[in-house]
Amino acid sequence: MRTHILLFIEGETEEVLFPAIIQYYRSNYNCQEVEFHYKNLRGIGNYKSKAKGILQETINKVKKGNGILKVVICSYDSDVFDYSHNPPIDWKLLKKKLEDITKAKNIVLMPSIQSIEDWLLSDMEGLCNYLKAKKPRNLPGKNGHEKIKHLFKLYNKVYYKGYDSENIVAR
């Protein structure tokens, strides 16, 4: 019986990064027996409206193939909620609703504390190689996204969140 994992993501950059990370682990640690399903909900608000239906659909598909859905991971940017008195999603309630569908306690909430651009900045050498640029002394900006936009602008380029991150990760 093949093991399946469903990973909910909320944006284009995650759609590029998570498969690359999993491919890295598969090729380096012999993790071929697990099948991953990525579902881009295209925004945090769609966790409420789409996640339950997609989960049920995935469970049915996995059962048809004699597999088992072991884990559901909900990845989201936590910075959206940092200063909100009334956050748009009650994550505990969503987790409970998803657990009711799976009949198990295998729902993992995975808030991203830093943006994916912050991860990309941790490989400044690779980023500069991609741009064919020299490593800057410092980058202004309050977060990784602003810093990468500034770096691209220094070299007369525009940073496109999904597209450029895919090319950067591929290198």
What are the roles of these predicted feature ranges?
Residues 47-48:
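Short glycine-rich substrate-engagement loop in P-loop NTPases that contacts/grips substrate
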Residues 1-4, 15-41, 52-171:
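C-terminal accessory helical subdomains adjacent to catalytic cores in phosphodiester-
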Residues 9-15:
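Extended, compositionally biased accessory segments flanking or bridging domains
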